Amino acid sequence: MKTLYSLRRFYHVETLFNGTLALAGRDQETTGFAWWAGNARLINLSGKLLGAHVAHAGLIVFWAGAMNLFEVAHFVPEKPMYEQGLILLPHLATLGWGIGPGGEVIDTFPYFVSGVLHVISSAVLGFGGIYHALLGPETLEESFPFFGYVWKDRNKMTTILGIHLILLGVGAFLLVFKALYFGGVYDTWAPGGGDVRKITNLTLSPSVIFGYLLKSPFGGEGWIVSVDDLEDIIGGHVWLGSICIFGGIWHILTKPFAWARRALVWSGEAYLSYSLAALSVCGFIACCFVWFNNTAYPSEFYGPTGPEASQAQAFTFLVRDQRLGANVGSAQGPTGLGKYLMRSPTGEVIFGGETMRFWDLRAPWLEPLRGPNGLDLSRLKKDIQPWQERRSAEYMTHAPLGSLNSVGGVATEINAVNYVSPRSWLSTSHFVLAFFLFVGHLWHAGRARAAAAGFEKGIDRDFEPVLSMTPLN
């Protein structure tokens, strides 16, 4: 083993706390890791590590299925999803299952089917996980070389990377096929207040799709989070799926170039750190997406975005006061700016008052009232429809505010209000988890780099201070 690669850089690649690598056994003596170090004991036991991963997948899928069935059992069709603390049914609804015009739930059976399928498949994964963890071969290299690997084998590692990329690409295309051929997906922008429709006219122009990546992340630009039509979203998945599949084929057929061999650390812990970094980035992006985007995450299911609830409040009071005789075009507010309407920095007519900061909001209930120069005064006077008033009043009272103890609403809200938006939950949880994943990335990257440099040996167990302390009992 010692002669494989440069000693300085690649040995000891796996960072053990004591001892050297040994293939058999999963105890501290043979692996250098105690039971609480989890999968670190399985670094060189590919069969057992497979079992751990399959069992983990089983737990994930079981949660999805059980939580899905729990939400179905508690679901009240007469109330909006976002009032019921649901986080899984809104995703199924967004995919167009069981949904009619306006986001109304017309059939809960597809949700039940989804839950049952996940619970059943979790049993298969659970059995596979237990089999490989307890009964299957400890290592796969001898009997099943296709599934075996050595962490330092760069060619094998990029082949595994390629297989993963192909699977991700297939996943992206599943959404494309659902939108194109299998009933379509929910479009919050469909005329008359949202509906399920098949996406026929995909956006495949690279300048449009990759233009999102070149946008500023700030303000009205919003990077990829600013996407606001389904043609772009589904077209983006065509591009993404194709890139993943072709990239996967490339990584299977090729070996890493010399610069990559030199630049990267090639050890199990290094791969773990790369994966944690990637998941962290995904989590931060998902956080922003669910918080700001009301196309991929329709407000009918997830509740309004923060800017949307704020603009809805301004709109609701504009409607009320206009009915009471106010001239909303010229009324002056307490600051000397327009009370109901004012101009944005670039000259558009926007809602006045505190909601001016959210002037770039786009929402299906508001866009029909815009003209070429922002909000159109004549439309505001003549064209406001009852459904727009109802929806804005509903969104105004369901802003994504609230604390962890589920006391919802603004700070002045009475205690009887018990509402926390799924947007708050999903964005907060993804931000927190992304942060933890990032810290894990730093930790494991540091250990992997130190091991590759040959100076990280961990704590010497023989002289660990706790060994000389009085036993607790």
Curated annotation (Swiss-Prot):
Q: Where are the transmembrane segments?
A: 69-93, 134-155, 178-200, 255-275, 291-312, 447-471
Question: Which top-rank group of organisms is this from?
Answer: Eukaryota
Q: Which residues carry this modification: Phosphothreonine?
A: 15
Q: Which InterPro entries match?
A: PS_antenna-like, PS_II_antenna-like_sf, PSII_PsbC, PSII_PsbC_sf
How are cofactors bound according to the entry's free-text note? Binds multiple chlorophylls and provides some of the ligands for the Ca-4Mn-5O cluster of the oxygen-evolving complex. It may also provide a ligand for a Cl- that is required for oxygen evolution. PSII binds additional chlorophylls, carotenoids and specific lipids.
Q: A GO CC term?
A: chloroplast thylakoid membrane
Give residue numbers for the modification (N-acetylthreonine): 15
* Residues noted as binding [CaMn4O5] cluster in the record, renumbered to the chain: 367
Q: Which Gene Ontology terms cover its molecular function?
A: chlorophyll binding; electron transporter, transferring electrons within the cyclic electron transport pathway of photosynthesis activity; metal ion binding
The subcellular location is: Plastid, Chloroplast thylakoid membrane
**What biological-process GO terms show up in the record?**
photosynthetic electron transport in photosystem II
* Presence of keyword rRNA-binding: no
Residue ranges annotated as propeptide in the record: 1-14
Keywords, in A-Z order: Acetylation, Chlorophyll, Chloroplast, Chromophore, Manganese, Membrane, Metal-binding, Phosphoprotein, Photosynthesis, Photosystem II, Plastid, Thylakoid, Transmembrane, Transmembrane helix
- Membrane found in the keyword field: yes
Q: How does it sit in the membrane?
A: Multi-pass membrane protein
Per the entry, what this protein does is: One of the components of the core complex of photosystem II (PSII). It binds chlorophyll and helps catalyze the primary light-induced photochemical processes of PSII. PSII is a light-driven water:plastoquinone oxidoreductase, using light energy to abstract electrons from H(2)O, generating O(2) and a proton gradient subsequently used for ATP formation.
Family listed: Belongs to the PsbB/PsbC family. PsbC subfamily.
Q: How does it assemble?
A: PSII is composed of 1 copy each of membrane proteins PsbA, PsbB, PsbC, PsbD, PsbE, PsbF, PsbH, PsbI, PsbJ, PsbK, PsbL, PsbM, PsbT, PsbX, PsbY, PsbZ, Psb30/Ycf12, at least 3 peripheral proteins of the oxygen-evolving complex and a large number of cofactors. It forms dimeric complexes.
Listed name of the protein? Photosystem II CP43 reaction center protein
Q: Which organism is it from?
A: Aethionema cordifolium (Lebanon stonecress)
Organism ancestry: Eukaryota, Viridiplantae, Streptophyta, Embryophyta, Tracheophyta
